[in-house]
Amino acid sequence: MTTLIEQLITKMGLREEPNVLEKTTELVRLLELRSTNVPLQINEYGKIVLCADLASCMIGIAFDKEQALKLSGLRKSQYLNNKRMFEKLLDLNKLASVNDICVQLGLNEVARKAEELMTLFKGVAATEDMGTDTSHPQYATMAVFQACRLLKKKVSKSKLMPFSNLRPSQFQLLEQQWERMIAKHHKESKVPSSTDMEGKLKENQNENIKGHEAKKAHKPPPEDYEIWKARMLAKAQAKLKELEASQSHMDSQLLEA
């Protein structure tokens, strides 16, 4: 059995991954113990491949499901049904998170955006009091799918849907609901690149230069000295006449007194 496990692990390209062989072997042995009274309608190849699938999920490494399906000798529906049964027998009924899905499908570059969308969905669900169980894996799956769409990352729906536990028609309906939610509530947060920042800085510098030149343009030209001199003399004479008139008025009042 150990030799067969090693052969299949190697064929799946997991031989160099740390702890996969050990974890797969552990799950195969545990499955044999717990399935004593539960007849499993599956061959040894399928059993080992499914345990390797579960082991990869637990460790958090990518797993090629298409290659696994070929090696297992099972139809897709049989593969998925047996996987769910194994999860129950092995107490592995953990709900798939955004990170789990991204890791298993090799979509780590969209994980941050998917988490952002998941947080948005939870906020909208709480605000609108929808009574939604946001822990259901369909929502984490849809968050990853929509993140791929927004970031223009190609992903196959057929690879995502098994995580959601939805039928194709249900998945399509959920997809439409999320697209409406994103259109209404989601705002793209763009981190400016160094090129954008340089362009903005140059634009600000140009605006400052233009503003300085405009101020210079509005500044009146320097007054000719002779004109200034005449204006100052006229102003002084007017002030002197005003003082003389005021003094004359005061003298008249004193004489009358």
Curated annotation (Swiss-Prot):
**A single GO CC term, please?**
nuclear origin of replication recognition complex
One GO term of the biological process aspect: DNA replication initiation
Gene3D superfamilies to which the protein is assigned, alphabetical: Cyclin-like
Q: Which domain of life is it from?
A: Eukaryota
Region annotation (Disordered) ranges: 186-222
**Primary localization class, coarse:** nucleus
The record ties this protein, via InterPro entries, to:
ORC6_cyclin-like_2nd (IPR054113), ORC6_cyclin_first (IPR008721), ORC6_met/pln (IPR020529)
Instruction: Alphabetically list the UniProt keywords.
Output: DNA replication, DNA-binding, Nucleus
GO MF terms listed in the record are: DNA binding; GTPase activator activity; protein homodimerization activity
Q: Where in the cell is it found?
A: Nucleus
Q: Where is the composition biased (Basic and acidic residues)?
A: 197-222
Q: Which family does the entry's similarity section mention?
A: Belongs to the ORC6 family.
| Quaternary structure, from the entry | ORC is composed of six subunits.
What does the function comment of this entry state?
Component of the origin recognition complex (ORC) that binds origins of replication. DNA-binding is ATP-dependent, however specific DNA sequences that define origins of replication have not been identified so far. ORC is required to assemble the pre-replication complex necessary to initiate DNA replication.
What's the protein called, per UniProt? Answer: Origin recognition complex subunit 6
